[in-house]
Design a protein with these regions (language model features):
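Alpha-helical transmembrane segments of multi-pass integral membrane proteins
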Residues: 17-25, 49-57, 89-93, 129, ...
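N-terminal, membrane-interfacial amphipathic/helix-forming hydrophobic leader that caps
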Residues: 1-75, 216-281
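Hydrophobic alpha-helical transmembrane segments of multipass membrane transporters and ion channels
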Residues: 60, 92-100, 161, 260
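Transmembrane helix-loop-helix hairpins at the membrane interface
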Residues: 120-280
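Juxtamembrane helix-loop-helix connectors linking adjacent transmembrane helices
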Residues: 28-50, 70-139, 146-151
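N-terminal export and membrane-targeting signals
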Residues: 2-17, 81-89, 120, 153-157, ...
Length: 281
């Protein structure tokens, strides 16, 4: 595959990579529910079922990313330069972004206090599950597809194309509103920029984990309303105008999230452009 023209390889990566992910997300959950969930027994907790789904689906995504990297000559698992430092920066960006989005929701008057809570061990287990989920997504999109496309068409095109694919595939996960899709594209651009700038996946994984993990396990904003199977430190619900997060999609479909992403992303794009070479095996 490495001897093929880079443009052909890039196009094939987008088509085959998108198709494989769509097929997995389309049929995988049903297969897990029919064949694996019964193995847990009738009394299995929601947290156990959620863990099984994430391990089965996102473990497969991670394996596909690593296999694809081996076939294409891309170091999918490359952490990038100064991984601890870049992970810290990524985590701070993720926490800052979600904080801005929540602030806009609070200003709009849609934030409500719920009644959920979570035990420490459950929250730690939930953190590991969220980490696996976001790490698998970053391995696939920013660790594999983005570098392959960047070889042919450069970092800018790669970040944009992979971000659009990232957003479209989330349609299979329930992201239905136009605002939600725009936010997913912007989030993909943010994670893609971090990957390209740092030369690896440590920074985007940390940013993605900080954003999703705090939204679910610290603030209890996903799902909305209520809390997930692992509980949350706080339980904030969003009720009111959908444009500020008052829908079932919560912050992900809010204008506040869009503003937060732009506040974080625009200065980064203005400050510097991604420069490192694509990592090769």
């Amino acid at each position: 595959m490495t001897s093929t023209h880079p443009g052909v390889t890039a196009g094939a990566a987008l088509v085959l990579g998108g198709g494989a992910m769509a097929a997995l997300l389309g049929v995988g959950p049903g297969l897990v529910e029919r064949h694996l969930v019964p193995l847990l027994g009738a009394g299995a907790s929601d947290a156990a079922v959620e863990t099984l789904f994430v391990v089965a689906i996102f473990g497969t995504i991670a394996a596909l990313a690593i296999l694809g990297g081996t076939l294409s000559g891309v170091r999918t698992l490359a952490a990038g330069g100064a991984p601890a430092r870049n992970a810290g920066i990524g985590g701070a960006i993720g926490l800052g972004g979600i904080g801005i989005a929540i602030s806009y929701a609070a200003i709009a008057g849609v934030v409500r206090s719920g009644e959920g809570s979570g035990a420490v061990l459950a929250l730690l287990a939930g953190a590991l599950v969220v980490l696996l989920q976001v790490a698998a997504e970053e391995l696939y999109f920013r660790g594999l597809l983005q570098p392959v496309v960047a070889r042919a068409w450069g970092n800018g095109a790669a970040i944009g194309l992979v971000s659009v694919l990232f957003a479209l595939l989330h349609l299979l996960g329930g992201a239905l509103s136009p605002v939600s899709l725009i936010n997913l594209v912007l989030g993909g651009v943010l994670f893609g920029w971090l990957a390209a700038r740092s030369g690896g996946i440590a920074a985007p994984i940390a940013a993605h984990f900080a954003w999703n993990g705090s939204e679910q396990l610290i603030f209890g904003l996903d799902p909305n309303p209520g809390v997930g199977p692992f509980g949350s430190v706080l339980d904030l619900d969003l009720a009111g105008a959908a444009r500020w997060g008052g829908s079932a999609e919560g912050l992900n479909a809010s204008v506040g999230m869009m503003i937060a992403l732009l506040v974080v992303l625009v200065p980064l794009l203005i400050a510097a452009r991604p420069t490192p070479e694509v990592a090769r095996a």
